[in-house]
Amino acid sequence: MLSREDFYMIKQMRHEGAYIVDIATQIGCSERTVRRYLKYPEPPARKTRHKMVKLKPFMDYIDMRLAENVWNSEVIFAEIKAMGYTGGRSMLRYYIQPKRKMRPSKRTVRFETQPGYQLQHDWGEVEVEVAGQRCKVNFAVNTLGFSRSFHVFAAPKHDAEHTYESLVRAFRYFGGCVKTVLVDNQKAAVLKNNNGKVVFNSGFLLLADHYNFLPRACRPRRARTKGKVERMVKYLKENFFVRYRRFDSFTHVNQQLEQWIADVADKRELRQFKETPEQRSRWSRNICSVTGYRLRYQLLRYPPCVLGQLYRGWW
């Protein structure tokens, strides 16, 4: 088989008027080959031929390992080499490659929860103008798993107290609490997560105990478990914070957010359900009712003379 350079030389010499016999002499091939190549619009692809003679005795073993979901060719190569295989790696890869389409998918299967069962929590960050100054705004997104309704709380810091305040505000906004709250492995909620053995932050456990929800943490390096809320973080960045870039204060940011959610976000159609979050929220009315919860850093805003009154009642 001739090379690509030979192919283009044949085309060029013929275009310049050279005889086929002269082209064949120059290239070093037969006149018949020259005529065949002149008919091709492009250089013919070189076919790689792999002889599987050396690999054939080990094919049953390789197929067994693939069925066990072992797809690393280096691992299989080492194993069959120890069994007496004398061929190379390329032959093994050539055999495995067409079978890779049989490999089980790594895609996460979306888990749909029942109404009032789960809330997913996550944080995002954008840079906007607040009170005439460019600054970073941290925003907590709390999304109901069933209806996809969400609440957003903007804060100057992404810390434990603002994490808890975002959940308190979300429960108050939704009119109740859910059975489980799914969080990322942020220090505000999770101190340690070792293969499912989770140590939660004591402050987060106090909040969970007060609202009677079960805290849950994502598996490490698998944040896509809470894909619903991560999509809402992206949705906010690409919609609300593109439309609104200037605010008078953080209070103004949160007012604008709640208004935008009511006017826009809750009225968007969810393609997989052909309903809006507002329509699906009618099924979430069975979420548990809540009482107020006062955060430690909020108490510091008041003088000692009124703290006693605040401790006697929840807002």
From Swiss-Prot:
Annotated PROSITE patterns: HTH_IS21 (PS50531), INTEGRASE (PS50994)
Coiled-coil blocks: none
SUPFAM superfamilies from the UniProt entry: Ribonuclease H-like
Annotated keywords: DNA recombination, DNA-binding, Transposable element, Transposition
KW DNA-binding (keyword) present: yes
Function: Involved in the transposition of the insertion sequence.
Record family assignment: Belongs to the transposase IS21/IS408/IS1162 family.
Protein name: Transposase for insertion sequence element IS640
Gene name of the record: istA
